[in-house]
Each structure stands twice: as structure tokens, then as C-alpha cells.
Curated annotation (Swiss-Prot):
UniProt subunit comment: Monomer. Part of the p-toluenesulfonate methyl-monooxygenase complex TsaBM, comprising the reductase TsaB and the oxygenase TsaM.
Record's keyword terms, sorted: 2Fe-2S, Aromatic hydrocarbons catabolism, Electron transport, Flavoprotein, FMN, Iron, Iron-sulfur, Metal-binding, Monooxygenase, NAD, Oxidoreductase, Plasmid, Transport
Gene Ontology biological process terms, A to Z: catabolic process
Pfam families in the record: Fer2, NAD_binding_1
Cofactors that this protein relies on: FMN
Domain annotation FAD-binding FR-type: ranges: 4-106
EC category: oxidoreductase
One MF annotation (Gene Ontology) recorded for this entry: metal ion binding
All copies of domain 2Fe-2S ferredoxin-type, residue ranges: 232-317
Binding positions ([2Fe-2S] cluster): C266, C271, C274
Originating gene: tsaB2
InterPro entries for this protein: 2Fe-2S_ferredoxin-like_sf (IPR036010), 2Fe-2S_ferredoxin-type (IPR001041), 2Fe2S_fd_BS (IPR006058), Beta-grasp_dom_sf (IPR012675), FAD-bd_FR_type (IPR017927), FNR_nucleotide-bd (IPR039261), MRET (IPR050415), OxRdtase_FAD/NAD-bd (IPR001433)
Protein name per UniProt: Putative toluene-4-sulfonate monooxygenase system reductase subunit TsaB2
Matching SUPFAM superfamilies: 2Fe-2S ferredoxin-like, Ferredoxin reductase-like, C-terminal NADP-linked domain, Riboflavin synthase domain-like
Amino acid sequence: MSADVPVTVAAVRAVARDVLALELRHANGQPLPGASAGAHIDLALPNGLVRQYSLVNATGQATMDCYQVAVGWDANSRGGSVWIHEKLKVGQALRVSAPRNLFEMAPEHRRVLLLAGGIGVTPIYAMAQACAQQGVDVELWASARSAPRLAYLEELKALLGQRLHLHADDEQGGPMNLTERLATQRWDAVYACGPAPMLDALTAATAHWAPGSVRMERFKGAEQPASERQPFELVLQRAGLSTTVDAHESVLDAMERVGVDFPWSCREGICGTCEAPVLEGEVQHLDYVLSPEERAEQRRMMVCVSRCGGGRLVLDI
């Protein structure tokens, strides 16, 4: 992790069906580094896993008394959410990173639509609080599979009143129709976090909007079909090493295989920890960290998911 801060679990409570909210305080009682809305922390669990969670209470403070995160139960979890839901107790000692923000709100956006799906409400709730504090004209659409799964519902109602619009899939015959609801653009920007189908629908519905007016955070990076993955040569320039990255492995896997210890956290292309400088090669970007402009520059990549489209990739490592 980029930093190592000792924390203690001060409180655990349910904020929706299968969603637990955690309050984390510095183990020594010190203030924690502050963050702006949209920021996340890396949370290191005793089972050896490191997971990223959005800060629900980050609104731009210089320091924070505590970090608040929410964790949804995931039956397909690789061990993070299951461990938290089944084993985490008040008083548990953990370690976290300093906050990072790859989903920051632009100050020039004064009319904002916030769109949350499921556990994606966590950064969106922080943004709603920040908008209220800064006098931004904000509207929030929150959706979930069923009403009991809408997290922070009472807090959002108190904060937004009639500017909060709720959608339960089981009561309304399926997911929200974004194409219909976004037919008229009344906002400077949309900020969205939720499951891939919702964000894919948002992308299609706003394809004609101005660049930079739709910003989203995904739960995991894109997956390249196995039929499109080809082996390629990897050169680590400063280390003086080269190897072949097989079709079934990532650049990060190959680096570790040849003995290079490179920082990583999510291994899903969403946290930005494993960003590496590119000297040569056609990068196939599969992350959700870099902007379209940064991707076009071909100067850096997330080695946990992105690959090389040509025969040779040279990294400044």
C-alpha cells in the first residue's frame, strides 16, 4: 500500500440488507489524513487481502476524525467482503493507506446529477454531502435490486429531500431506463458508480454529451476476451530483464515471476497503484483509471490488467 496507517474498528452497523458500515479510527487517537469526495482507501485485512473502499464521509477536509466505509456482501467474493461480514468485530486492529482520489468532482460543475447503483452509493453519498456544503445544485438517482438494499437511505432523504429519486428494480419491472430519463440534459455533469450494466447503459445514453461531462467509477476493469489475448515480449529496461507475457497472465504476473516486486493493490484496474511508465509498445488499456487523453499518450499503463497490442512492450522499470 502507498501508506500504512494503523486503525481500529470503532463501530460496525448495518445500513441496508447485506451492507455493513465501518467506522475506522487511528489506533493512537490521532487525526487521519483528509480527502475529497470520491476518494478511497486501501484496507489491509488480517487474511492477507487488500481491498479498496470509498470514503463515505470524505468531503474535502484537511484531516478526519474517522474513516467511514461500507461493504456489501458478495457471494462471489474472493475473501474480502465475506471476511468483513463474517469475522470483523469492533476493536479489530487493521491497517489502511492514505486516501487516493481517482473519481474527483470538478469545481466548475455547478449543476450535478449523481447516479448510484447498489453499493456504488458509497462515493456518491460523499459527493452529495460535498455538493450540499458547497451550494452545488445536485440531484441523486439511487437504484438497487430491492428497496431494503438501498444503503444510507434515511441519511440521503434527510440530506436531499425531493432531490433524491429512488428506484427498486423488483418494484419497477427492471433497471432504470437511463436512455429515457437522460433524454434532456439538464446538468453540467453526471457522476456515477454502480454495476457494469448500469454504467454501460449510461455510456450509451450520454454518447452525444460533451467530453468530460460523464464521469464514473467501476468496480473492476474491463475483461479482454481470451481469444484476443496474445503473448508478447516484456522488457524491464532499468532492471535489465525480459520475459514473455503469456496469453493467460498479466504484465504484473510476469514481473513477479521474474522476481520484480512492484506495488499493486486491486489487480482489477481500478485503484491506480500499479501504474507503470511505458517507453515503447502499443498498450491495450483495460483499466478505469486513466482518462482517454492519458490513454492516447501511451506513456503509462496499469500492469495488473492492461496488455500490449504489438509484439514488444518496454517499461521504465
